[in-house]
Regions:
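Class I SAM-dependent transferase core
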Residues: 75-116
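Conserved Class I SAM-dependent methyltransferase catalytic core
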Residues: 97, 223-280
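Conserved class I S-adenosyl-L-methionine
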Residues: 117-126
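Conserved SAM-binding motif I beta-strand of class I
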Residues: 142-147
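S-adenosyl-L-methionine
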Residues: 157-190
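Mobile active-site "lid"/loop adjacent to the S-adenosyl-L-methionine
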Residues: 200-229
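SAM/dcSAM-binding transferase cores
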Residues: 279-330
Length: 330
């Protein structure tokens, strides 16, 4: 039972029976144990009993009970934290360990352009931080959160509900490198998106040692073909003239521009500096599908002032929901 965790604890036989029936109905295997015992015999309602489910089934089991109005009976999910972003405008549930969202996701959302009623795909969405931040800023935009990791997809779905974005935002499980047929199977039809936003894995495996956490390693470490694969997927998804917005490490800018050609043009490059006069650590690039216009560079965003305090510009974006120049059409 090393791969099982406690879903809830109770000594009410009616509640325990109802929970068992709900889990059985959902096809979720579970065990019922006395709190301090390794037996499945009852304890006459004196000692609380534990309902255990496998790690892989925990998110689904919690959702079943939440949908049944039993969220208050659930044990706290110690594997997940709930954190505020955009100064509390959105809240996001994410793994306590492993891949967690950061400033990059919020900066990406602040740089993404979209019009009323348009569809934007957040490719490699994780728990949905960037796409949900975009949807919170633009009330008429529809967003699809596309993510390969099933656990992160489940958390993204929770975050959609947590931020009351059902109907405008949805989450699908799919690999960014999937075929056009596989993308279509989850509702991502070729040539239909007005925008694609993405924060691909970008750490160089020859420089950065991969995390022992598999999900974190997949989210952070790039393969040799990662960038080209993701850009190819974006090109397939975008409608003619659609906009791609990508955040990447600054020392890889030339690789990024090379992979954008010849399918994207009108690239606008926005360097992100950690402090004044320091080398850029990130670039955000916006480009237009099938445009032949040459690239331009925009004024840099400086995250911290000379005293290492957050700059006013960064605070406006990260806490107040301000946008970057890339969010406006060229």
């Amino acid at each position: 039972m090393s791969d099982m965790r406690e879903l809830l604890r109770a000594n009410d036989p009616v509640l325990l029976s109802a929970v068992g029936a709900l889990l059985d109905g959902a096809g979720i295997p579970h065990l019922l144990l006395d709190q301090n015992m390794s037996v499945m015999e009852g304890s006459l309602g004196i000692i609380a009993r534990r309902v255990l489910v496998h790690d892989d089934d925990m998110r689904a089991a919690r959702r079943v009970l939440e949908d049944a109005g039993l969220a208050h009976e659930l044990r706290p999910d110690t594997e997940v934290t709930e954190d505020a972003a955009l100064g509390g405008r959105i809240r996001l549930r994410q793994p306590r360990k492993g891949h967690r969202f950061g400033h990059d996701a919020i900066l990406l959302a602040a740089a993404t352009q979209a019009g009323a009623g348009e569809q934007v795909v957040d490719l490699g969405a994780g728990v949905g931080a960037a796409g949900i931040a975009l949807a919170a800023r633009l009330a008429d935009v529809r967003v699809t959160l596309a993510e390969i990791d099933s656990r992160l997809v489940e958390l993204a779905e929770e975050n959609i509900r947590l931020n009351e974005l059902e109907g405008r935002v949805n989450a699908v499980q799919v690999d960014a490198g999937a075929s056009a047929w596989a993308l279509s199977a989850v509702g991502l039809e070729a040539g239909t998106a007005a925008g694609v936003m993405m924060n691909p894995p970008f750490n160089d495996p020859t420089v950065h040692r991969a995390s022992p956490d598999a999900a974190r390693a997949r989210a952070h470490v790039a393969r040799a073909d990662t960038l080209a694969t993701w850009i190819g997927a974006a090109h397939r998804l975008l409608a003619p003239g659609g906009a791609l917005t990508v955040i990447w490490r600054a020392d890889g800018l030339q690789d990024l521009l090379g992979d954008l050609e010849p399918d994207f043009g009108a690239a606008r490059i926005l360097p992100i500096l950690p402090r004044p006069r320091a080398p850029a650590i990130r670039v955000i690039v916006g480009a237009i599908k099938d445009s032949g216009t040459p690239p331009t560079t925009l004024p840099s965003l400086v995250l911290n002032d000379a005293d290492n305090r957050p700059s006013a510009a960064a605070e406006a974006i990260l806490r107040e929901g301000a946008t970057l120049p890339l969010a406006a059409p060229a």
